[in-house]
Amino acid sequence: MRSILALYITLMPVILAGVLNMIFCKSSLLEVAYRPMDAGLILKDGKRLFGDNKTWKGFFGMIVWGALAQILWSLLLKSIPTLEKLHLVYAFYENTVLFNLVLGALLGLAYVLFELPNSFIKRRLEIREGKTAENGWKWTFIWIDQIDSLIGCIIFLLFYIPLSWQQMLGILILGAGTHLGVNRLLYWAKLRKNRM
């Protein structure tokens, strides 16, 4: 139970940043940045590189929200030392505002960068943006949609701290389950078009 709590304490800023970024992307703030990252580029196969849903607003938004969420979470944890001790990164690094600014921004960057290959592959397989595959790929991509960004966060964390295979697997399983639950809440709040 303690190890599950440690994983959640470590991942919480990324989870919060993802929710805040979804709200931000649906808002009218900075609409000028709501432009596709691929600028409408169509490759030789006649398909878009990433599609309309991968925007600069979402890309930079996740980096900024990641930094802000990490800072706020770190300040909260400072007031609860028993929880702060469980944070996997703070076992190796001091919990400072500057450190958390960088950590949160880089986790946000890892999150959005590792979503891009998934979008690229889905466009090749003619899976529409923001939709679930309706063919034999359905369950494969439901799973990949939940873990692609988590893989990015794990790889990034490995540059900072040692993670056991159990911790990495725990991040994927807990993160995927949490991602599905949060997606449902965002769907019910009409911030997301797809339940998965």
Q: Residue locations for each model-derived region?
A:
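Interhelical loop and helix-boundary elements at the membrane-water interface
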Residues: 1-152, 161-196
